[in-house]
A protein has these predicted regions:
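Conserved binding/recognition cores within well-folded domains
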Residues: 1-89, 93
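Inter-domain helical "communication" segments and dimerization helices
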Residues: 1-10, 103, 107-123
Length: 123
């Protein structure tokens, strides 16, 4: 995973042989089903033929967290954590891998604190 800079704030994906760019801050979460990844964001849902791991490498590692085999969440959009789920916009629940729950939640709070600290320095 790479760190965010001005050149990587957009995620480049190919949909029906056309390259499109999605602002990473606008992505809520990514969901993988086989070789199709659904990217849920402010502008709707984009379906991409790819592996989740390939897209994960292009995402800002400070902003995104892999919470199980099939999902990556944008920590900026997590509104709550209840039991084994992240609550996302649109009342969507993203499951947290049960055996790694403590570690994943700790990573979430660490990333969230780093992001908040970085935001305070900018403003």
């Amino acid at each position: 995973m790479k760190k965010q800079d001005e050149k990587t704030e957009m995620l480049e994906v190919t949909i029906q042989q056309k390259k499109i760019f999605i602002r990473q801050r606008d992505i809520y979460f990514l969901e993988s089903m086989g070789r199709v990844v659904s990217i849920y964001c402010k502008n709707g849902v984009f379906k991409v033929y790819s592996r989740l791991g390939e897209l994960e490498e292009k995402l800002d590692s400070d902003m995104f967290l892999r919470c199980n085999q099939s999902y990556i969440v944008n920590i900026l959009w997590v509104s709550d954590i209840v039991d084994y789920d992240f609550y996302m916009p649109g009342d969507r629940l993203v499951p947290i891998r049960k055996r790694d729950k403590k570690e994943i939640i700790q990573k979430f709070y660490n990333k969230r604190n780093e992001t908040d600290t970085h935001r305070e320095k900018i403003h």
